[in-house]
Curated annotation (Swiss-Prot):
GO molecular function terms listed in the Swiss-Prot or TrEMBL record: GTP binding; GTPase activity; metal ion binding; ribosome binding
Protein name: GTPase HflX
Entry's transmembrane regions: none
Keyword 4Fe-4S set for record: no
Assigned protein family: Belongs to the TRAFAC class OBG-HflX-like GTPase superfamily. HflX GTPase family.
Stretches the record annotates as Disordered: 150-173
Cofactor(s), by name: Mg(2+)
Gene assigned in the entry: hflX
GO CC list: cytoplasm
Length: 437
């Protein structure tokens, strides 16, 4: 959790604040404040209160005006919060000003998300990616850690000299810390370059084998990992918590027509996902960019389902994957009335021209429809046919096994008779060997 400045104990009660300026934004800001409550609760911190603060204008010092800032200070005192969490992204200087005003820990939405990511990271790659994002966030904020030296020096025996000595010590240490942080950032970036190369090698091997790929994307906690577990028949960690999955998990499945498909689960998205996290996780999120198509999972039971769908598209556009072919899975339809399901499909229609598959992943309903939708998606990439290969071309038989899926093999007088599903490019090369011409 977050350490309170000048106190060794940990944060127990946080007051949540969202500052907004346009009255028409009040509804959306309230929804985001509710989401922030879920995020903070995922850190094990109690909620002392949450408040929407309307400000006429944006101010550089506190984001809102001084009068509103004093109002926030009083609210924090009244609810006995030991931390104030802003849904707004605060600049380093705004964060410092707020901490001076309320005399408690002040953090923003980005720091909350970074802390959750740090707790969820399991693999070396995910740990490095989160560490990189956190250090880039902390670098311009290092002066906060030494604020207490100013206060201690100014209030203890040395008068001006004591304060200057404390400040001097703090300033020297800040510079040392910054140099160490920059060196660590560079070291992490070098290590992540190696990870990116390893991923590229793995992708080339998959391309050589001509195995189709799909990436499962969507808002955090929409049911992506549960979907992968269902269709692959293998256990994938799926927990009812935000950002349970930070590491990509890939499973090979077989579609109804026999073609193999590699399905990859990806990290969940969220509104205002910090750009530095998107950058840090680029090597992981490339799985979505380079997949043949996407499966976006939408929690149909969530009142913000359409907004979550739009947020996912925004992040995909940022990654350069916004134009990928996509299947949309409306998950948890067992929890919503029929008319709500129809309304959702209508609301998605202006944004999406692909296939919508209603499912209840938890109940196992709709799996067949999804697999058939995947077959339809890949039909333009593969062909199924019978081939008669002369015995003198055993190299082609071996290639058919490695490049596609062979269903049957029969040895006849003229050669080897095979029924197979092949990628279109390889199929075209073998058209002269079609058995049913």
């Amino acid at each position: 959790m977050f350490e309170i400045r000048e106190k060794p104990e940990m944060v127990e009660r946080a007051m949540l604040v969202s500052v907004y300026f346009d009255p028409s934004e009040a509804g959306e800001k309230q929804a985001m404040l509710d989401e922030l409550e879920d995020l903070v609760s995922n850190l094990g911190i109690g909620i002392a209160g949450k408040h929407l603060i309307k400000s006429r204008d944006m101010h550089a010092k506190f984001l809102c005006g001084t009068g509103k800032a004093q109002e926030v200070k009083q609210l924090a005192l009244d609810c006995r919060a030991d931390c104030v969490v802003f849904d707004n992204m605060l600049s380093p200087s705004q964060q410092r000003e707020w901490e001076r005003l309320v005399d408690e820990c002040v953090i923003d939405r980005e720091e909350v998300i970074l802390d959750i990511f740090a707790r969820r990271a399991r693999t070396r790659e995910a740990t490095l990616q989160v560490e990189l994002a956190r250090m880039q966030y902390s670098l311009p904020r290092m002066a906060r850690m030494w604020n207490h030296l100013d206060r201690q020096g100014g209030g203890s025996g040395g008068g001006k000299g004591g304060g200057g000595a404390a400040r001097g010590e703090g300033e020297k240490q800040i510079e040392v810390d910054r140099r160490l942080a920059r060196a660590r950032i560079e070291a992490i970036q070098r290590e992540l370059v190696l990870v990116t190369r390893q991923r590229a090698t793995q992708r080339k091997e998959r391309e050589r084998q001509a195995v189709a790929t799909a990436a499962i994307v969507g808002y955090t906690n929409a049911g992506k990992s549960s979907l992968l577990s269902l269709v692959s028949g293998s256990e994938v960690m799926a927990r009812d918590m935000l950002f349970a999955t930070l590491d990509t998990t890939t499973r090979k499945i077989e579609l109804p027509h026999g073609q193999p498909l590699l399905l990859t689960d990806t990290v969940g998205f969220i509104r205002n996902l910090p750009h530095r996290l998107v950058e840090a996780f680029k090597s992981t999120l490339e799985e979505a960019v380079l997949a043949d198509f996407l499966i976006q999972v939408v929690d149909a039971s969530d009142p913000e389902a359409v907004r979550h769908y739009e947020t996912t598209l925004e992040v995909l556009n940022e990654l350069g994957a916004g134009d990928k072919p996509m299947i949309v899975v409306l998950n948890k339809v067992d929890l919503v009335p029929e008319e709500r399901r129809g309304a959702l499909e209508t609301l998605l229609a202006p944004h999406f021209s692909g296939r919508v598959v209603p499912m209840s992943v938890k109940e196992g309903n709709g799996e067949g429809d999804l697999l058939n939708a995947c077959v339809e998606m890949l039909e333009s990439r593969v062909r199924r046919a019978r081939f008669l290969i002369p015995y003198t071309r055993s190299d082609l038989v071996a290639a058919m096994h490695s490049e596609g899926k062979v269903f049957s093999t029969e040895y006849v007088e003229e050669g080897t008779l095979l029924e197979a599903v092949l990628p279109v490019a390889f199929y075209n090369k073998l058209e002269s060997f079609l058995a049913d011409r």
